[in-house]
Structures are given as C-alpha cells and as structure tokens.
C-alpha cells in the first residue's frame, strides 16, 4: 500500500512540477509593465521559476513573490523614441494615423535590438542559453520573438498589455482587418461614416497593412544581419507562438471571434493593486473640494510638456471655465503658465486612489486601456482625448457604450472640453451605464488571474499547440485560397472575353 502511495505522490508531483520560464517585456512603459508584473508574479506564486528581462520603469517587481528574478535594462528608450519620431506630431503630442509608418516603427524595432545586444541581456544569454521551458514575450513588437531562438527554440506565449495588433491576431488565425467590425486599431476615425469617408478609411486599412508589411520585411533583414543567415525569419518565429493573451475585456474589442489560443483577460493589473497612498496635499485638495473634482491625465506614454502653446492654453482656459476643481497631471514646467486658482498641478498622481475618491466627478483621459479599466472600476465618467495608438478606438467605444464622450485632440478648444465635462457630469445616464458595464465585466466564468495561469500551464504541456487553428500564421494567398480562386477567375474572365469578341467581331 505504501508503495502505491509513493508512486501516486510522485505522479502528482510530476504533473504539477514547476517550469523554468523566461519573460521578456521590452517596452519601457509604466502602464505596460504594470500588467506584466501582475502576470509574472502570478506564475511565480504558482511555483514556477520566472526570470524577467525588462527595462527599468517606476514599476517594481516583487522579488519575494516566489522564485522571481529580474534582469534590468536601460529604461529611457521610449520617451527618447517619441522625441526622435521622424513624423511631426500634431499640436506637439498627437500621433494620429498619419504617423503610423514603417519608418517610425522601425525605431522601436531597433530599440529592441539594442536591448538584446546589451551587456545584461547577453550576459544572461551566455549563462542560461538552453535552460527554459517557455518564453513569455510582449506582443507589441514581433522582433522580440528572436529570444525564442536564442534561448533554445522554446515555445512562446505572447501577452499584450492592452489591445492586440492585426498581426498578432493573424499569427493566431483569428479574425482581423475587417474595416467596419474589427478595424485596425491604429486608425483614428471610427463609427458611422459617409460613403466617401468609408472609402478613405478602407484606403487607410490598406496603407497600414502595407506599412506593417514593410516593417516585417525590414525586421527579417535585420534578423539575418544581426544573428546570421541561418536565423529564423518572422514567419517561422510566429509559428512558435502557442497562446496570445489580450489584456482587454472582449466587449471592448467588439466581441471578436477568436480561437481558444487567444484569451481575453481584461483588467489584469487591477488584481495586483499595491495601494499608493495619496500625498497629504492631494488628499486635502480632494477632501476639501465642495464643487467636486475633475481629474485630468494624458498618461505616461507622451510628455505633456511637448504640447504646443495653443493646446496648453485651450486646456487652461477650459479648466477656468469648469465649475469644478481640477487635478492636472503635467510633467512639464509650470512657471511659464498661468494656472487657474481651481487647478492643482503635479507630475504624478496615484491614479487609482484619485479615481476612488468620492469627490471625483469626471476623468479627462487619453483613453488608454489601463486608465479606462480604472475609471470603469470606480464608476467615473470619461472624456476621451486620444493622442496615439489604440486610444481613438477606446474613446470611440466610450461613446458606443455610453460611458463617456470622445473629442478630437487636433481640433480641441476650451469650449469643447468644458462642454464635454459638463455633459458627462450632469447626465446620470453615464454613471448608470458604467454600473451596468462593471457588472458585466465582473460577471465572468473565470477571473483574469485564473485564466492567465491555467492557459499558461496548458501551453507548457506537450499538447500546447492543440488550441491553435489551422489558419494560424498562414499568408493571405493561402488564407484566401488563391490556388482555387485564380483558376476560377481566369476561366470567368476568358469566358466573358470570348463573349465580347463574338459580340463585336463575329
């Protein structure tokens, strides 16, 4: 009997044994790293040995959360990239669809390449070349997938801190690039469109596909140049991806049809909250406000000090017009600005704690994913002023879901902003819609934390590819069955041509 118990225990231990996981998250963004920290600490607490390679940001990873090791890289890359962008930003900080080019995004690829060739990364590569069971990598830049080759051809899980790109979905064989229902998130114009506007947006979809195709070609060339002619290309690297985590609720992605190899999490960082107490001055400002407070923050991805004088003046004039007090996150100098008496300016706020406060009436935001999650959780109506990336799509969803309004940052006036704040604070419907949406997001069959751990451990098993669809990572010619369509179109064309010849010649 004892022998059977020993065998049983050994089998159980074998089935539940910890894995050696490498995580590489190259983007030096506070909001991105918040999500990644929540994810890897879950894995470490589960008993897996996790090594994280990431640039330094304000986000500290808890090295006491199980077997968790961090390898720190330089963290200044993102803002330097933003400032060095070759395309002029509108009003100083607005990077709309026109700025989405292969040239601009190639700089991001080169940032990842510099990280991989940095001394800390290379030192770890030499000491642990073939010791990992799984690579977890940020989904934003596919060039980072080369780590799966460098560390011994390991299987891959990709995780996006927010929305996934069209290329991520194509890698998994999910629906993508439908210009109306599942549009490219780099667009800035959504919603009901005239016929002519619809044609222009279709052109934008095709242009974006071309730009990212050019970027993929350049990444392939760089991979061969930096890692040798035998290095795998992007298509081969993408084939190693077993699972994609998308950290938005599916309702924000139009309930896109996806295979089981794509899992929506949504609000993962909310399950890893470390309380940041409000400073005494901020707490007093919030507590003593008799009119209520509007919180204004455009995130950490762009420096608000770079906005042009016209936009800064529009914001300050709007603050002066509002019948509320204002907390404004501004990372630039204020000595050259005339700050209204009702405005408290600071370079950094404990955002979630601010939004929790009972006196906060509205949130003027760039419409980032994490900011949206925090506003919904705290039932704060939103005024979206998108500046870059997927933010225009998020702001568009505010309007569709009835939880806020969206403004065009390139044309923003003081009157527009003041009117929008008055609209979301005076109409009870916005808060009611937020309550309804929060109930929906909380009512899930499994929590984001449970899904993140369960599906990662599924990907670790030998049958980890079982979740993937046959359409995963195929090119457009194969996906559209060109081998069948081309002959059919040729026959149809020849038939019509023959009819025309008979009509006009015979």
Curated annotation (Swiss-Prot):
Keywords recorded for this protein, A-Z: Glycosyltransferase, Signal, Transferase
Top-rank taxon, per record: Viruses
Entry keyword annotation includes Coiled coil: no
InterPro entries: Ecdysteroid_UDP-Glc_Trfase, UDP-glycosyltransferase, UDP_glucos_trans, UDP_glycos_trans_CS
PROSITE patterns noted in UniProt: UDPGT
Signal peptide (UniProt feature, chain positions): 1-18
KW Transferase (keyword) present: yes
Stored SUPFAM superfamilies: UDP-Glycosyltransferase/glycogen phosphorylase
GO MF assignments: UDP-glycosyltransferase activity
Top EC group: transferase
EC numbers: 2.4.1.-
Family annotation (Pfam families): UDPGT
Function field: Catalyzes the transfer of glucose from UDP-glucose to ecdysteroids which are insect molting hormones. Expression of egt interferes with normal insect development and block molting.
PANTHER family, A to Z: EG:EG0003.4 PROTEIN-RELATED, FI06409P-RELATED
Sequence similarity: Belongs to the UDP-glycosyltransferase family.
Protein name per UniProt: Ecdysteroid UDP-glucosyltransferase
Organism of provenance: Lymantria dispar multicapsid nuclear polyhedrosis virus (LdMNPV)
């Amino acid at each position: 009997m004892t022998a059977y118990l020993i065998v049983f225990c050994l089998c159980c231990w074998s089935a539940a044994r910890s894995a050696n996981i490498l995580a590489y998250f190259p983007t030096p963004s506070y909001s991105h790293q918040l999500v990644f920290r929540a994810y890897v600490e879950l894995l470490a607490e589960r008993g897996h040995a996790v090594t994280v390679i990431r640039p330094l940001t304000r986000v500290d990873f808890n090295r006491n959360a199980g077997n968790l090791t961090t390898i720190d890289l330089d963290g200044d890359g993102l803002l330097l990239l933003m400032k060095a962008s070759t395309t002029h930003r509108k009003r100083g900080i607005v990077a709309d669809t026109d700025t989405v080019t292969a040239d601009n995004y190639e700089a991001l690829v080169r940032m990842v390449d510099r990280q991989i060739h940095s001394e800390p990364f290379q030192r770890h590569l030499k000491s642990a070349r073939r010791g990992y069971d799984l690579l977890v990598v940020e989904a934003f830049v596919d060039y980072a997938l080369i780590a799966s080759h460098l560390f011994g051809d390991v299987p891959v899980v990709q995780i996006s801190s927010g929305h996934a790109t069209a290329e991520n979905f194509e890698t998994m064989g999910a629906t993508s690039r439908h210009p109306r229902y599942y549009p490219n998130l780099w667009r800035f114009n959504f919603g009901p469109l005239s016929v002519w506007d619809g044609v222009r947006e279709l052109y934008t979809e095709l242009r974006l596909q071309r730009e990212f195709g050019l970027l993929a070609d350049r990444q392939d060339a760089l991979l061969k140049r930096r890692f040798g002619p035998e290095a795998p290309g992007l298509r081969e690297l993408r084939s190693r991806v077993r699972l994609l985590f998308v950290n938005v609720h599916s309702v924000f992605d139009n309930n896109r049809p996806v295979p089981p190899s794509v899992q929506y999490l949504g609000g993962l960082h909310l399950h890893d909250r470390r309380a940041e107490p409000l400073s005494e001055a901020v707490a007093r400002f919030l507590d003593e406000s008799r009119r209520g407070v509007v919180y204004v923050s455009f995130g950490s991805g762009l420096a608000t000090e770079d906005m042009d004088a016209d936009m800064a003046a529009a914001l300050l004039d709007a603050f002066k017009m509002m019948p509320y007090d204002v907390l404004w996150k501004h990372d630039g100098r204020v000595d050259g600005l005339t700050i209204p008496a009702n405005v408290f300016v600071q370079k950094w706020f404990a955002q979630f704690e601010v939004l929790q406060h009972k006196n906060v009436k509205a949130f003027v935001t760039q419409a980032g994913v994490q900011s949206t999650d925090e506003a919904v959780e705290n039932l704060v109506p939103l005024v979206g002023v998108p500046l870059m990336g997927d933010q225009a799509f998020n702001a568009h969803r505010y309007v569709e879901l009835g939880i806020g309004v969206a403004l065009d940052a390139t044309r923003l006036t003081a009157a527009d902003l003041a009117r929008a704040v008055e609209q979301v604070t005076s109409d009870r419907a916005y808060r009611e819609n937020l309550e309804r949406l929060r109930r929906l997001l909380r009512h899930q069959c499994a929590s984001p934390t449970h899904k993140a751990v369960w599906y990662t451990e599924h990907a670790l098993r030998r049958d980890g590819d079982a979740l993937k669809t046959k359409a995963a990572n195929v090119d457009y010619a194969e996906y559209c069955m060109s081998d069948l369509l081309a002959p059919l179109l040729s026959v149809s064309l020849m038939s019509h041509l023959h009819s025309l010849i008979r009509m006009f010649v015979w």
